[in-house]
Every structure is written in structure tokens, then in C-alpha cells.
Amino acid sequence: MASEQPVEAAPTGGSLADRITKPDESNTSETPAPAADQTDGAPAQLGGSDLHEPEYNVEVKLSDLQADPNNPLYSVKNFEDLGLDPRILKGLSNMNFRKPSKIQERALPLLLNNPPKNLVGQSQSGTGKTAAFVLNALSRVDLSTEQMQKTPQALILAPTRELARQILGVVQVMGQFVDGLIIGAAVPTDRDSRPKRLECSIVVGTPGTVGDMIKRRTFIPNKLKVLVLDEADNMLDQQGLGDQCIRVKALLPRDIQVVLFSATFPEHVHQYASKFAPNANEITLQHEELTVEGIKQLYLDCADGEDKYKTLVQLYGLLTVGSSIIFVQTRAAAQEIEKRMTAEGHTVVSLTGERDPSVRDAIIDQFRRGEAKVLIATNVLARGIDVSTVSMVINYDIPELHQPSVPGRQADFQTYLHRIGRTGRFGRVGVSISFVSNREEWEMLNQIQTYFNCEIQRVDTKDWDEVEDIIKKTIKNSRANPKFAGGKE
């Protein structure tokens, strides 16, 4: 059975991975009964959600230009055809994966082929990309001896501690029947604790911590076979994270298989990724198919910054219908809103990067369990976190790019896409509300509408009964109509 190396102290109540219970093998069938309303994917009790299978075409570009990407060798319709270890197949079956998703159909043969080749994959959240790279990592590790079981062979990097913990949970569930599998976490620890030596076959972590552990020789990387970057665009585009990723890669074996996955790949990041993972096979969705279906996009006019806060308080009753995330631009804003709303008797929590790791873990776990309904966050949560109960996202501050050389304020389209993607997950219905309090914010909202060729509906805050009616109807609807179409290059 798979085990997790206790590299970090888990908070009471458990991390996602800690809360995953292994099924009783005596009652476990090889093919579990299909879950209602679920096509593929890990059920909620195993830390997963339904897969979202939108209508899209998967485009494949092979590094070998003489090869035919439409050859059946580069596609698969069932997991059994991949020649997987039966114990991995059993893990997939217990996660309720009955057949590969569209992305997995094309990605898995390329990932698992020998000799290993690099892969750059662009696929929106909820399409099975995490399961694809985890399955590849499980298939690549050698667990034939006790020494190899304690030797890092696959490294998965994520931009945030929260996403790393989520991926670690997927590895543990998928590998739960693999004897000798040990999983380690290389994520920031509380200030008073020191990371222990990693003795595991698969490591999930963040770039900064991994780099530090390699320098301290608590992580020996010389036997690594696979390097995965999830949300790769975010890591390669951010100066700090990008530099850390480059430094980590420079310390790894030169023949390592590099796998990059992300929901978005702006052109300049794609060029960077091509250098980070040279001669890679590429899998992409057509740009116009980068959709977030089922999200009703609204905006509210606010007189000024103070009116923004009053509007948020006015919305509080609606925020707790399901779970909600309020996105702000700065840590100071998150802390100030939390302080004021708590003083007024509202139950909210904030999640920002400077909090101690154990506190961040506890907050995320409370939010997943529904004990905390309203979360105030900076962009630390905009990437990849799957919480199926989120029904509303508030853009208290419209996301913007800081480009001193460009006149005026510029909306950050990719962050907007990732933010509103926290709701309406896996085909569910959700609401996104943006606050607009001045002309510059109005211009940024228009930039978003133009880029994504979508209409964001104005709601008149003078009539709060109407506001409540619109939002409640949207959340209760089985389907939301507006399409969030892909934007321009």
C-alpha cells in the first residue's frame, strides 16, 4: 500500500491527503458502480470531483515532424490498452475513472511511451490533466527494492502549497494499491520546524522549498526520472517562481522527462516553456474552446472604495448560500476586510501568502468541509484549487497586470479566467460578480469583455431584492446560459 512520508506536520483534522480513507479491500470491487451524474474522476469522498468534458478538439503536435499525430498509436480509448500495472488500474477504478477523458486519450500514450519524451500540455482545469501526469509518475517509478522505494524518482511542482497538497492527495488515492509507494511533500513548513530528509519515490512540492532542500542535501535528486510543472504558465511567468524552477531544473539529471501542464499558455510563456522542455510533444485546446461554461458573469457599480465594502456586506447573505471566494489585490485589503466583517458579526476567513503554513492548511480544510463558507483571498487561490461547493466568486478588485511601461491600467485576463474558474467547477452552475468603483476599473472590465468576446451583465444595486433574485435564480438553475468564449490572441 502507498504511504505518505511525514515531511511536514499535518494540522489536526488532517490535510486533504490525510483525510483520504483507503477502502476496505474486502468490499472493493474492481469496477465500482457508476456514481450518479459522474462521467469520470475521483468522487468527493476521495478528494476529487466530476470531470468536465466540454465540446472541444484536442490538437497534437509531435516533436517528430515526420510522425502522424492521427496515428492510433498516439490515442487510446481505454486504460487497459496502456499496459498499466494492475495495481494502478485498480486505483483508477476506485477513483471511478471508467475511461480516459479527451485530454487523457491523447496525453497518456505520449507520456508513457519509451524512450520518455517531454510534453507541454494546455488543458483547462477539470479535464483530467492532474490524473494524467500522476499516472505517468506512478508508472515511471521503480519500487523493486526498499532502497529504490526511498529514492526520489518523480518530482511534481506546483506554484502554491495549497495546490501541492491537493496533488499529493491525488497521488495517494491513485497509488493506494501500489506496494512500497512512499509519497513525500516538499512544501513550506512553519518557522520553528526543519524539513526532514526525503526518503520517498514521488515528491510533490513548491519550487522554493525543493531548491532549498536540494541545497541542504535533504533531497537527493540524482535518480529523478520525471519532472512535472502544474500551472506551469504561472510558475514560468513569475520572476521569482520562474527563476526558482530554472535553478531546480539545473540540479536535476539532464535526461529527465519534463512535463508542463496548465490551463492557459500565453504566447510569451509558451516560448519560454519550449526552452524549459525542449523537443516536446504538444497538446493544446483551440483558443476559442477555453471556456468556462455555466458561469453567470455580473458586475455591480459602486460609488467608491467604501461603497465596495458596504456592497460586499449587503451581499453576505447570498455568499453563504454555498461557498464563496472574495478575491482582492493585496494582503492588506484581505486582512482589513476580514477584520471589519468579523467585527460586524460576519463569519469570514482570509487566506494570504504570509500566513504560517499550518494555518493555511487549516483554513483550506475548513473551507473544503464547509465549516467556513466565505473565504477572502489574494491570487494564491486563483490557481487550480478544486472546491466543488463554490457557487460564487467576487472580484472585489479586478485583477490587473502591473506594467509600468504601458499607460493606463491593464486587466489581467489569465488571472480573471482562473479566478472565475473557481466557481462553476466541472459543469456546475456558478456566479461571478465584479465590483466597479471608478473609470479605470470600468475600462479594465471592458478590456475583459472585449478580450473574451463576452457580455458581463450589470445589476442595479438600488434594488437589492432584484440583485438577490437574479443571483438566487442563477445558482438554483440547472444550467446557466451565457458562454464565456475564448479571447483573442
Curated annotation (Swiss-Prot):
ATP binds at S123, Q124, S125, G126, T127, G128, K129, T130. A motif (DEAD box) lies at residues 230-233. Residues 110-283 form the Helicase ATP-binding domain. SUPFAM superfamilies: P-loop containing nucleoside triphosphate hydrolases. GO terms for molecular function: ATP binding; ATP hydrolysis activity; inositol hexakisphosphate binding; RNA binding; RNA helicase activity. Belongs to the DEAD box helicase family. DDX19/DBP5 subfamily. This is ATP-dependent RNA helicase dbp5. It is a peripheral membrane protein. It comes from Neosartorya fischeri (strain ATCC 1020 / DSM 3700 / CBS 544.65 / FGSC A1164 / JCM 1740 / NRRL 181 / WB 181) (Aspergillus fischerianus). GO terms for cellular component: cellular bud tip; cytoplasmic stress granule; nuclear membrane; nuclear pore cytoplasmic filaments.
